[in-house]
């Protein structure tokens, strides 16, 4: 059998055919044929048909083929960008501000005219509107905005005002102001002369008094808005003291005068008594707050520094403007000032003789203010509200006003606004008051610079600021930061004192920690944009002259609270403006953490922005790692947490229950001299502690006495006011924990026992240790307060190597702690001053609510001219959480309260008494509170429950202590 006929598997394949052989030969010939040759239907070899490996394939054209030879292309690796950063960032537009319609930005004067007024400081007035909550500051601003803009801030349909300077959505929802917002308005006086009035509308709630502090720093005067019905309330009192301390002139606007007519329904004579009483109370507070009351002008309508107004009805006047209106109405040429001076006080008009006299006419009569001002005002209100059209027409005609027939078809409130605004005209009287009693930036420069600038008076910068020199060195004081619409960065708001700030200019940004000796807190930034801030819109400008307020972009990166801007190229020493001095303290704190731990960096960044946005807010990290926020009260912290969640971090945040800050103090002198040796056993410090004199801590905090005084000044002050001996008064080394701290360190050593040169050599180290200890006390790491530390003995090594700061600082801190613990230590808690408005039948319930919370009433008096009572009380801050809700519940919502920090008080009980047993879920007795507060505070901070004596007492000190007391139980101290 022929094997070639079968395959490998035995299948028959048959013999080879001739045609198959020819086909194979032809294929071999084709493979050998040259390219371009002709061989049947195949003519060329296409390279694209060759087999190409996957890694060699070309899927897309190269960049040169697409863009050409002249275009440079850059290729970045895929891992150059973090995973958290999106390739295309979404546009962040957080709607936290109220939008503005284009028509609402149109003013009666051109923008160029407004900018031109900025260059003439004599035509500029910088003021802040301050006052109590709901006294009408924002609505009064609405009236001024309406008179300068082609718009109406009043909605006739729902009888509500726009609240133009409440730019945040939550401000509109809560019906309170949270942030201070400026506006620059061109107002005309009675002679039709235009002035640029930079006005800052500040919050009236005492929780946000830090905004008022930042505003007063930029202002040359304070305009107090006082409710005619309520009178002077707690925030007005505090604002008066604040303005006096800042050396600012004061003018008053008695607002809501129509409440005396429509709500209280007082007769005109009683309304006059009510207004006069309000002015007397203001003058009493001014006199009480001033150290030299003789230099302060009293508030007197006859002097022109009082304006009567109703923001809701859209009218305002002074006695001078009312007298001018009478002169114009009757066409009589008269001395307006003399006539105005007779419209206030016990002055009567005698119609028979046509003269004014201090005695009433025969048969009786009303005072001139009642006869010429209140009675016509009452007549307008009564007739418009009574809807007597004919009588209204007659009354308005007597005053020279005619309204159209369509006007009388309006509702009562719009008709009242129209009638009053037609009678009283524009706010020219208010402008006259500002021009006459508030100095221009040039006139106020010396007083402002002396109060806020830390440099010397013999420097060129000081002279330029006093002169408001536009060609001098640039100096800008920044006190406020406003977030942009995406809340990623801030624009800063400040006042130019000298020089001219321009866009594109490089400036040095000096922080609060800057000094010519330590330039670490300094950066150089470029000003990218400048605006005039107009609440809901901004006017771009290219430069800002001295005396102007300006909003600045591009310099916020290193600013936390306040800053000083100066020329980047200026070579002389530059000092900063002082940090803001607030009239309250942030004593309420809460801890926060993100719901998702991976979002902690976002929350930390949000907390940093919170610190920028809120002047008094303090954010810090405890030793336990928790992030805490300190604020003035519950409302303040609520606003902060809302902004943290919705604006600045956009993460879900968990918030702990609020707690309070404590202080540590002593009530007796140290029971023995306490000493501590340095680690190298070459030095030894001996110290005792004792309480400070009553009132001294407040004097230090208020700046009545300063550690920067020389020894003679300090000696005279302490010797005359606190009866210190001259040697002790001149031995003061430092205040602690800072220059305005409420603790004092004295060198009470004898020159015969201690080498003075060696003591002076280690003075700085001992002071640092003392201030470190005063900042964090031994009980629960809270600041020490009201303690005097005396160095009674010291053994200092003569070799500098053995008495270095590393040896002396911790030793000074330790001996201060031991002296403190041997002086009967106590805890101090913050206490609120509470002012409650209530009807008389709710006073008993208020006493009950306060007594349950360790509070007590100091006075309850009727509010003059009203059916309400004013209850004044003190309440520990730690007991205040939920107090307002509790109060409203027990009074059926009829009582309204405001609370503000007032003083520190000692907590009942001994915090070191280990015999006290704290039981969970049970209220502690009053005498156990100090122990409970200390233990819980230490737990929260991640510390051990008890104070360990081994940490603060040397072994030799413990032995001596045991010998004197016969007990070593003090290890628990």
Swiss-Prot record:
InterPro entries: EFG_III/V, EFG_V-like, EFTu-like_2, EFTUD2_N, P-loop_NTPase, Ribosomal_Su5_D2-typ_SF, Ribsml_uS5_D2-typ_fold_subgr, Small_GTP-bd
Domain tr-type G: 122-408
CDD domains linked: eEF2_C_snRNP, EF2_II_snRNP, EF2_IV_snRNP, snRNP_III, Snu114p
Region (G3): 201-204
Binding site for GTP: 131-138, 201-205, 255-258
Parts of the chain that traverse the membrane: none
Domain of life: Eukaryota
Segments of this protein annotated with the region G5: 381-383
Acidic residues: compositionally biased ranges: 17-33
Keyword Transmembrane helix belongs to the record: no
Gene Ontology biological process terms from the UniProt entry: mRNA processing; RNA splicing
Short name of one Pfam family: EFG_C
Region called G1, residue ranges: 131-138
Chain positions covered by the region annotation G4: 255-258
Chain intervals for the UniProt region annotation (G2): 175-179
GO cellular component term, pick one: nuclear speck
Annotated tissue distribution: Expressed in flower buds, open flowers and siliques. Expressed at low levels in rosettes leaves, cauline leaves and stems.
PROSITE patterns in UniProt: G_TR_2 (PS51722)
Intracellular or extracellular location(s): Nucleus speckle
Molecular function via GO: GTP binding; GTPase activity
Keyword GTP-binding included in the entry's annotation: yes
Signal peptide location: none
Family to which this protein belongs: Belongs to the TRAFAC class translation factor GTPase superfamily. Classic translation factor GTPase family.
Role, per record: Splicing factor involved in pre-mRNA splicing and component of the spliceosome.
Protein name: 109 kDa U5 small nuclear ribonucleoprotein component GFL
């Amino acid at each position: 059998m022929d094997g070639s006929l079968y395959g490998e598997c035995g299948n028959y394949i048959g013999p080879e055919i001739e045609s198959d052989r020819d086909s194979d030969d032809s294929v071999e010939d084709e493979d050998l044929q040259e390219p371009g040759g002709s061989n049947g239907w195949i003519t060329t070899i296409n390279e694209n048909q060759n087999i190409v490996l996957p890694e060699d394939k070309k899927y897309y054209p190269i960049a040169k083929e697409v863009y050409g030879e002249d275009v440079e292309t850059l290729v970045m690796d895929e891992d150059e960008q973090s995973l958290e950063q999106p390739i295309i960032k979404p546009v962040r537009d957080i709607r936290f501000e109220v939008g503005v319609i284009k028509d609402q930005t149109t003013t009666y004067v051109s923008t160029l005219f407004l900018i031109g007024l900025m260059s003439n400081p004599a035509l500029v007035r910088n003021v802040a509107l301050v006052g109590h909550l709901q006294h009408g500051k924002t609505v009064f601003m609405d009236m001024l905005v309406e008179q300068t803009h082609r718009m109406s801030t009043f909605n006739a349909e729902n009888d509500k005002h726009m609240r133009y300077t409440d730019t945040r959505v939550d401000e509109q929802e809560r019906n309170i102001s949270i942030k201070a917002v400026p506006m620059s308005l061109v107002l005309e006086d009675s002679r039709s002369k235009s002035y640029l009035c930079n006005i800052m509308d500040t919050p009236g709630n005492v929780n946000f008094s830090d905004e008022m502090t930042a505003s007063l720093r930029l202002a040359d005067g304070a305009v107090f808005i006082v409710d005619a019905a309520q009178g002077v309330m707690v925030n007005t009192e505090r604002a008066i003291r604040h303005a006096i301390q800042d050396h600012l002139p004061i003018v008053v606007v008695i607002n809501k005068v129509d409440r005396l007519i429509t709500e209280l329904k007082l007769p005109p004579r009683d309304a006059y008594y009510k207004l006069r009483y309000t002015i007397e109370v203001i003058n009493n507070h001014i006199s009480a707050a001033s150290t030299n009351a003789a230099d302060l002008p009293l508030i007197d309508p006859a002097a022109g520094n009082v304006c009567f107004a109703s923001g809701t009805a859209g009218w305002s006047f002074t006695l001078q403007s009312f007298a001018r209106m009478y002169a114009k109405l009757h066409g009589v040429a008269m001395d307006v000032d003399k006539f105005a001076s007779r419209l206030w006080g016990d002055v009567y008009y005698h119609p028979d003789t046509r003269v004014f006299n201090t005695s009433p006419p025969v048969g009786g009569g009303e005072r001139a203010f009642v006869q010429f001002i209140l009675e016509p005002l009452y007549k307008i209100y009564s007739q418009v509200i009574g809807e007597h059209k004919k009588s209204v027409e007659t009354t308005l005609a007597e005053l020279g006003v005619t309204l159209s027939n369509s006007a009388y078809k309006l509702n009562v409130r719009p008709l009242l606004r129209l009638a009053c605004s037609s009678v009283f005209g524009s706010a020219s009287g208010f402008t006259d008051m500002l021009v006459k009693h508030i100095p221009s930036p040039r006139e106020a420069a010396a007083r402002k610079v002396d109060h806020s600038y830390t440099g010397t008076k013999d420097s060129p910068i000081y002279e330029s600021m006093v002169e408001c020199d536009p060609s001098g060195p640039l100096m800008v004081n920044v006190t406020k930061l406003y977030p942009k619409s995406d809340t990623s960065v801030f624009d800063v708001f400040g006042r130019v004192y000298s020089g001219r700030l321009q866009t594109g200019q490089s400036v040095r940004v000096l922080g609060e920690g800057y000094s010519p000796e330590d330039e670490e807190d300094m950066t150089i930034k470029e000003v990218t944009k400048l605006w005039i801030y107009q609440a809901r819109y901004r006017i771009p400008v290219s430069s800002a002259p001295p005396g102007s307020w300006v909003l600045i972009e591009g310099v916020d990166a290193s600013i936390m609270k306040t800053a000083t801007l100066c020329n980047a190229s200026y070579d002389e020493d530059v000092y900063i403006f002082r940090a803001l001095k607030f009239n309250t303290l942030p004593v309420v704190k809460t801890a926060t953490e993100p719901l998702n731990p991976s979002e902690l960096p976002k929350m930390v960044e949000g907390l940093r922005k919170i610190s920028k946005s809120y002047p008094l807010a303090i954010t810090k990290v405890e030793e336990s790692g928790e992030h805490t926020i300190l604020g003035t009260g519950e409302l303040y912290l609520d606003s902060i947490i809302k902004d943290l969640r919705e604006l600045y971090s956009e993460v879900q945040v968990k918030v702990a229950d609020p707690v309070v800050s404590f202080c540590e103090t002593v009530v007796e002198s140290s029971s023995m001299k306490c000493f501590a040796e340095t680690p190298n056993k070459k030095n030894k410090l001996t110290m005792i502690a004792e309480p400070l004199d009553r009132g001294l801590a407040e004097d230090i905090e208020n700046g009545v006495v300063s550690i920067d005084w020389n020894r003679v000044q300090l000696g005279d002050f302490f010797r005359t006011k606190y009866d210190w001996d001259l040697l002790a008064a001149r031995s003061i080394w430092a205040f602690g924990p800072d220059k305005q701290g409420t603790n004092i360190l004295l060198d009470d050593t004898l020159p015969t026992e201690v080498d003075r040169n060696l003591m002076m050599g280690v003075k700085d180290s001992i002071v640092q240790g003392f201030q470190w200890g005063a900042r964090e006390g031994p009980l629960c790491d809270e600041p020490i307060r009201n303690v005097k530390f005396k160095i009674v003995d010291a053994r200092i090594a003569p070799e500098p190597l053995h008495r270095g700061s590393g040896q002396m600082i911790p030793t000074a801190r330790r001996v201060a702690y031991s002296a403190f613990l041997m002086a009967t230590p106590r805890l101090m808690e913050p206490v609120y001053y509470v002012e409650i408005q209530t009807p008389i039948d709710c006073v008993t319930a208020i006493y009950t609510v306060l007594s349950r919370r360790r509070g007590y009433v100091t006075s309850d008096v009727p509010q003059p001219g009203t059916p309400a009572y004013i209850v004044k009380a003190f309440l520990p801050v730690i007991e205040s959480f939920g107090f307002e809700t509790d109060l409203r519940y027990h009074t059926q919502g009829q009582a309204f309260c405001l609370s503000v920090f007032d003083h520190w008080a000692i907590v009942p009980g001994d915090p070191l008494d280990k015999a006290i047993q704290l039981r969970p879920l049970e209220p502690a007795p009053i005498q156990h509170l100090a122990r409970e507060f200390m233990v819980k505070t230490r737990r929260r901070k991640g510390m051990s429950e008890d104070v360990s004596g081994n940490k603060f007492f040397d072994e030799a000190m413990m032995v001596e202590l045991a010998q004197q007391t016969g007990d070593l139980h003090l290890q628990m101290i």
